[in-house]
Amino acid sequence: MVIIWNIFLPAFLLVLAKASLRSSRDSANCKLNKKQSQLNSFLWTIKRDPPSYFFGTIHVPYTRVWDFIPENSKTAFQQSNIVYFELDLTDPYTISALTSCQMLPQGENLQNVLPRDIYRRLKRHLEYVKLMMPSWMTPDQRGKGLYADYLFNAIAGNWERKRPVWVMLMVNSLTEVDIKSRGVPVLDLYLAQEAERLKKRTGAVEQVEEQCHPLNGLNLSQVIFALNQTLLQQENLRAGSVQVPYSTEDLIKHYNCGDLNSIIFNHDSSQVPNFINSTLPPQERITAQEIDNYFRQELIYKRNERMGKRVKDLLEQFPEKSFFFAFGAGHFLGNNTVIDVLKRYGYDVLHTPAGRSIINNGKGKKNLLPSKFSSSSLPVGLSAPPCTVTSRIKQSINSHKDQESLPDILLDDDIDQLDKDERKYKKRKQRKEKHRHFSDLWVRIQESSTDTTPQIRIINGYITVEPHPREHGKDKYIKAAQSVSFSLSIPSAFLLLAWCFQQVAVLQ
């Protein structure tokens, strides 16, 4: 799933689910088992020589789950030669593509697209969120230079230019619980940062467009229905008449201590009726079911097929390398999973329980990841050099009409040559400008003499865009707090794409 179904599933459940009312205040406070064998494991081993691994992530602050991740999962990560994610979380192209994906066509805005009543309710709710945000933020966030006005503008700025489906996801991420979690890298991003720090090769099996286009594929009537349900849910929450059926805390609890086949992770179609609000009128229930079926097919099953085939092609092209594939946990649970796809290609994929030893392939590095979280292990920032393997995949995908197949990636000679080119590129770049960190919250945009270039802001993976006045002769920069590490969302995946992304990307 900054991940689209991972991002999208919790948001969608929030809209459609009806569950017994309960408090989740202490739901994530499950006890840490001292015995490794008693920990949850989201690790699967692809049996070959050397072995490769699947690891299921969730899009929550990594500090909430790191201590509960078994040591053998961390060892598998350390020993792997190449780490693959759903999306390339460190590539500026990912950010700009996500930005473009969210925006309405030129000249359109939400006021012209949405029914008047829904537009007014949306505007009123965002005004409420802006008013409440200072009280939602923690002293620690303020101490790091993350302030309410800036955070609100970074997340919801220019909302009138966004497509309605992205506004719906944005609304679902503008809650007190999610605001309090901003400023700590989510698990996916933390692993990407660690892979870069350990100088591992990294890559991605998907492009942003492959996660993004299905969301934009909903017809307008379905999007308006979903946005209306989202606003109703939030309005009821504000009135105190309903509680969130599935919260981030519930997700964390199930990941740390729950059943791997928990309803939150399981995408089996038999679970769907539990997610549909039975109080809806019959016609609206049909619409809700159609939306659920559409996204299940587009964001889970089709993506699993595509991702599984690309994993298979990578394994075949690099038989001497050990891979660590970190995808949203939802891709490995339920029916028609990535694991099922690999098995159909003849691979033996086995779940690896906590406590089971990982065979040392002699090519990894030991004791490089902290087994326990501490404040000192929180990454300060991450540089974003070109991603060698991902770049070739991206170029090849663009040059092939059949995007269901993975094109040629890299041979060893190609990798060596590209590494040399990359080192030369870095040296030239360092002479031109100061080295930048991923946590800087801004992306340099080249000015155009013909087009107004949008400003891109990133807060915890939430991408916002606003046009700036055209100025010639120099680049424009978006200034931001540089002392905070931020996570980039997808369902998802999304990206995972935001903590709609952070909630439209949680399992992806």
From Swiss-Prot:
Lineage: Eukaryota, Metazoa, Chordata, Craniata, Vertebrata
Known glycosylation sites: 219, 228, 277, 335
Highest rank taxon of the organism: Eukaryota
Membrane spanning residue stretches: 486-506
Gene Ontology CC entries for this record: organelle membrane; plasma membrane
Alphabetical UniProt keywords: Cell membrane, Glycoprotein, Hydrolase, Membrane, Metal-binding, Metalloprotease, Protease, Signal, Transmembrane, Transmembrane helix, Wnt signaling pathway
Annotated signal peptide: 1-23
GO biological process, one term: head development
Compartments where located: Cell membrane
Tissue and organ distribution: Zygotically expressed in the Spemann-Mangold organizer, in particular in the head Spemann-Mangold organizer region responsible for anterior patterning.
Record keyword Cell membrane present: yes
PANTHER family named in the record: METALLOPROTEASE TIKI (PTHR31120), METALLOPROTEASE TIKI1 (PTHR31120:SF7)
Extracellular side: 24-485
First-tier enzyme category under EC: hydrolase
Residue ranges, Cytoplasmic side: 507-508
Name of protein: Metalloprotease TIKI1
Functional description taken from the UniProt entry: Metalloprotease that acts as a negative regulator of the Wnt signaling pathway: expressed in the Spemann-Mangold organizer and is required for anterior-neural patterning in head formation in embryos. Acts by mediating the cleavage of the N-terminal residues of a subset of Wnt proteins. Following cleavage, Wnt proteins become oxidized and form large disulfide-bond oligomers, leading to their inactivation. Able to cleave wnt8.
Other notes: Was named TIKI in reference to large-headed humanoid in Polynesian mythology.
Names of the cofactor(s): Mn(2+); Co(2+)
Protein family according to the UniProt entry: Belongs to the TIKI family.
EC number: 3.4.-.-
InterPro entries (alphabetical): TIKI1/2-like, TraB/PrgY/GumN_fam
Cofactor binding note of this UniProt entry: Divalent metal cations. Mn(2+) or Co(2+).
Coiled-coil spans in chain: none
